């Protein structure tokens, strides 16, 4: 009752809404990745879980969208004949913030991975509250990058489980400084 009239009812109802939002976003992302995999259309989706990514964190910040997250929009953004298909899509919550984003590449596994996988590793090495879904254009293989490590190959149902787990562990309200941790010094050679 103390919260009535304070504008703070989100404390009471916010977590249910956030859980529904997370569940909805996980479903959309898993379905879109699964469909991209089936048709062997490459994709790269960055999930900001509180890193507060800024345009200067990318080689090219892409085109700002601020659009509702949906399977159809993700499939269209990664269509081969569209100008944004080669870059990453940046997602936060249930919003697609931007598309055509060019990510910094990892220096690990240069001979083992393609550009999409190196980009996924690169962004997740630098920001610990960030995940990256990768769909290989060549094989249709799904991968998930987290903290500079790739889990692959995975199924779309495994992806859904991993995303649900990561969202459950993500802090509900991240502070600006908490998520910004740079974990790789690009001047040092990686073994």
Functional labels for PLM-detected ranges:
Residues 1-191:
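Divalent-cation
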